[in-house]
């Protein structure tokens, strides 16, 4: 009997041990994001990829639009085309994730996604590198399709030739539609249960998609974004971005990245935890397709580009969803300093129209602060927003007051929203902006005060805002240096920039940071036409420093 017992002990113990191991293994597989070794996802064999790429003549595709020696490499795309073409479409980039991200395991039944990339006259080298990075660094079974939407580029072959690549489809607009309507067109034909929007000058990093799809699979109302790394526009060096950033904005609806507060950082016990963000940059995100449709897609009446990220961000938060940045997902992006393409109504006018539509539909009584920051938006047409107001009502969305209190309490409400608008006069002359020879920003000068059809000439109308800026459209009075005699120039407005802040003291307009006063200096031939706008030490006796703000 003892011998029989001894014989049974080892087999029984072995079975129990195997059972325990199986129990822990199954439990581990059921956990959504436990720590452990990285899951190996199925990938096509090298031979399969080689066969697919053999059907595409990459050299011929790139050479057809190649930069030519002697041409300005920045002219067409506002980044260094020569350097982009020098770099392989298949280049390696550094893995910029936190080390703990590499230990996360994701479930194997993530939903495949439709990747939508819209573009207009994109450089072929960056477009191809975007697609190739997706194909190289994404598990094949997670890509339902890659939908390219060509927004009426000059050359249809920019898109058409790319359908030879695996998973790629091409749609071409018959006329320029802009980002919003192009994205909607791509989303309408998408067959995936989730939509992944990317810009056309990106490079996705290792295991970028799984963390995003995982968050949406857990909760379909989440809209999730990667951390956006920087691809240098001059050298195309891939640069790691800080992970503890979120999207923010000011009352002019100008997007800006902001650091998490010390309190928010202290609450983050794990660097892989998603970060709630009041607003997304808008270029790169994943959203459940049914949720996208239910929320009303995009505002179809927004033009070209700009402001759509505010509209969708307010709508998601106020109508029952949430926005997140997922630190374990990284995507590089070329950030340009200016747009390389033409806006039919001008960049500033288009942005004002789009943001004004957002303010009128979503910001309730707080839109007064938008108009105080952008006074020239008051008179701009913005189309009919009744359908978007009806959408908000039908979705039973929260108020903008709720959004400020619960999502973005850090946005301080101005104590006042008054605006003074009109001429800045010196006797019979008015401060005027004059644009010459297609220069990017106009010059300042004194000119005879003028009227057009009974109204003050637009080039002579200025607004003095509660932010202590003197502006015209998107441009603010600023100084190059803080020294006497420094020229006063027009630059893009930026809230909080002390070089752009002024105060009216009696007949003086004083620059706050330098304590110098707005003045005119003679130059050139010494005539009235040769007066330069500068700042100088304030002197009450100088008539050249006496200014009147005359309301329109």
Swiss-Prot record:
SMART domains named in the record: RICIN
Residue positions binding Mn(2+): 199, 201, 333
Location of this chain's protein in the cell: Golgi apparatus membrane
Domains (record comment): There are two conserved domains in the glycosyltransferase region: the N-terminal domain (domain A, also called GT1 motif), which is probably involved in manganese coordination and substrate binding and the C-terminal domain (domain B, also called Gal/GalNAc-T motif), which is probably involved in catalytic reaction and UDP-Gal binding. The ricin B-type lectin domain binds to GalNAc and contributes to the glycopeptide specificity.
A family per Pfam: Ricin_B_lectin
Pathway as given in its UniProt record: Protein modification; protein glycosylation
Domain Ricin B-type lectin residue range list: 415-550
Biological process according to GO: O-glycan processing; protein O-linked glycosylation
Keyword Lipid metabolism among record annotations: no
Membrane topology term: Single-pass type II membrane protein
Protein name per UniProt: Polypeptide N-acetylgalactosaminyltransferase 14
């Amino acid at each position: 009997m003892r011998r029989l017992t001894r014989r049974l002990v080892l087999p029984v113990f072995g079975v129990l041990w195997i059972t325990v191991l199986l129990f822990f293994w199954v439990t581990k597989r059921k956990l959504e994001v436990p720590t452990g070794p990285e899951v190996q996802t199925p990938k096509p064999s090298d031979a399969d990829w080689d066969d697919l790429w053999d059907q595409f003549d990459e050299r011929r595709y790139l050479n057809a639009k190649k930069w030519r020696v002697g041409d300005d490499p920045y002219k067409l795309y506002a980044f260094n085309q020569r350097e982009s073409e020098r770099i392989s479409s298949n280049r390696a980039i550094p893995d910029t994730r936190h080390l703990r991200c590499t230990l996360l395991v994701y479930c194997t039944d993530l939903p495949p996604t439709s990747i939508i990339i819209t573009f207009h006259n994109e450089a072929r080298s960056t477009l191809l590198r975007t697609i190739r990075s997706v194909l190289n660094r994404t598990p094949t079974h997670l890509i339902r399709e890659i939908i390219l939407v060509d927004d009426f580029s000059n050359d249809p072959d920019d898109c058409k030739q790319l359908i030879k690549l695996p998973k790629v489809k091409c749609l071409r607009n018959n006329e320029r539609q802009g980002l919003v309507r192009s994205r909607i067109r791509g989303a309408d034909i998408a067959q995936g249960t989730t939509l992944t929007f990317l810009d056309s000058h990106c490079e996705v990093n290792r295991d970028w998609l799984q963390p995003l799809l995982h968050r949406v699979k857990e909760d379909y109302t989440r809209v999730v974004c990667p951390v956006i790394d920087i691809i240098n526009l001059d050298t195309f060096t891939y640069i790691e971005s800080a992970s503890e950033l979120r999207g923010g904005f000011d009352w002019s609806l100008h997007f800006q990245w902001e650091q998490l507060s010390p309190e928010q950082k202290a609450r983050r016990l794990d660097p892989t935890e998603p970060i709630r963000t009041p607003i997304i940059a808008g270029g790169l995100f994943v959203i459940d397709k049914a949720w996208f449709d239910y929320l009303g897609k995009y505002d179809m009446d927004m033009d070209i580009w700009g402001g759509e990220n505010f509209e969708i961000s307010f709508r998601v938060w106020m109508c029952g969803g949430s926005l997140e940045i997922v630190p374990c997902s990284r995507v590089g992006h070329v950030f340009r300093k200016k747009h390389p393409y033409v806006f039919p109504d001008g960049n500033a006018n288009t942005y004002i129209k789009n943001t004004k539509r957002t303010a009128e539909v979503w910001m309730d009584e707080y839109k007064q602060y938008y108009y105080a920051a952008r006074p020239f938006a008051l008179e701009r047409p913005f189309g009919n927003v009744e359908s978007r107001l009806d959408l908000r009502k039908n979705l039973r969305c929260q108020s903008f007051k709720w959004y400020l209190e619960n999502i973005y309490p850090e946005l301080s409400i101005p104590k006042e929203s008054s605006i003074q608008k009109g001429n800045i006069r010196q006797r019979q002359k008015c401060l005027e902006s004059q644009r010459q020879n297609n220069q990017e920003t106009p010059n300042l000068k004194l000119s005879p005060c003028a009227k057009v059809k009974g109204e003050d000439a637009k080039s002579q109308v200025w607004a003095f805002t509660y932010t202590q800026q003197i502006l015209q459209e998107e441009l603010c009075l600023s100084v190059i240096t803080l020294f006497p005699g420094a020229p006063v120039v027009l630059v893009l407005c930026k809230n909080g920039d002390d070089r752009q802040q002024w105060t009216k003291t009696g007949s003086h307009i004083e620059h706050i940071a330098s304590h110098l006063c707005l003045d005119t200096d003679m130059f050139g031939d010494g005539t009235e036409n040769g007066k330069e706008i500068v700042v100088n030490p304030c002197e009450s006796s100088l008539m050249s420093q006496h200014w009147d703000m005359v309301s329109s």
